[in-house]
A protein has these predicted regions:
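Interface amphipathic segments
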Residues: 1-300
């Protein structure tokens, strides 16, 4: 719907996006008057866990000085509330400036009590321009849910650290160092994770070099790639396991076995599309599981 009252132009767009676990309703409203545009985006889902919220901003457009003036936009982000997985978060006031092919982000701040995401820096095609993202106790599950990466793999854990990005509009260079407390894969807790990650432009994936510290004095080591972009979404990881909790395997064996308990030590290759992951290697285990067809527990 687009309207043109006497003193401004207004537009409204509403749509519904169907997902595997429910629908997401979106509405976008904008009003333009003179050199300003006010925009409000509302969204909400109808799944068991609530994801909803509002993003509101006012953009002012200016012309730069010089013989060939360019359009400059100053966007003021207004304070609003967002619900992530039934938890209330706050978007704080900040400013984004778009000028001559550059985007300056000035203290974008998103928080829930002492958990937060803070973004500062410049986006451009210049390698010298960098954006810094600070994270404190951000649940990795939120990222996978919002990005809708896959319903067949679930990463959890509270991530703290810093990520950097440069040359974003040309050939992105992105890297991060994170500490993830109580890292888990498909409801199987693996331990505390220290990880270095970097975006690989050629492979269109994230290179990982990580260590997982749990009960063993020696950490488990994970090196490889995660491919978050569809349709190639999947992973290719080499794992040097030291008494690694095997609970995460229950998700992939649920058609034949359940109640998997125990730990494994050895070298394995964990790879494939998220919908059909494979696990190869040699592992010494001290574990048990229940085979449904026999209704019996076995030790392995």
């Amino acid at each position: 719907l687009c309207e043109n009252p006497s003193d401004h132009i207004s537009a409204k767009v509403r749509l519904t996006s169907l997902k595997k676990n429910g629908a997401v309703n979106l509405s976008l409203e904008a009003q333009a008057k003179e050199d300003k545009v006010s925009t409000t985006l509302n969204w909400g889902n109808n799944a068991i866990a609530t994801y909803s919220g509002k993003l509101a901003a006012v953009a002012q457009f200016l012309r730069t000085a010089g013989e060939k003036p360019l359009l400059k936009a100053m966007v003021d982000v207004n304070p609003t509330d967002v619900i992530l997985n039934d938890t209330l978060w706050k978007i704080h006031p900040s400013q984004v400036v778009v000028d001559s092919g550059r985007v300056d982000v000035n203290n974008f701040y998103f928080s829930h009590h002492d958990r937060y995401v803070r973004i500062n820096g410049r986006l451009s095609d210049n390698p010298a321009d960098t954006v810094k993202v600070d994270l404190k106790d951000i649940n990795m599950g939120y990222v996978f849910d919002i990005a809708n990466i896959s319903d067949d793999v679930n990463f959890e854990g509270d991530a703290t650290g810093t990520a950097y990005a440069s040359s974003v509009f040309k050939k992105p260079v992105m890297n991060t160092r994170l500490f993830v407390k109580n890292f888990s894969l498909n409801q199987g807790r693996l331990g505390d994770l220290n990880v270095y990650g970097a975006w690989d432009n050629e492979k269109r994936g994230i290179y990982l070099d990580a260590s997982i510290q749990d009960i063993s004095p020696s950490p488990s080591r994970v090196i490889g790639m995660i491919y978050p972009l569809k349709p190639e979404s999947g992973l290719d990881l080499n794992i040097d396991a030291h008494e690694l909790n095997l609970k995460f395997l229950e998700f992939y064996m649920k058609s034949i076995a359940q109640d998997i308990k125990g730990r494994g030590t050895g070298k394995v290759h964990f790879y494939g599309k998220f919908k059909g992951l494979n696990l190869d290697g040699a592992v010494m285990t001290d574990a048990s599981m229940k085979f449904d067809i026999l209704n019996t527990h076995f030790a392995v």
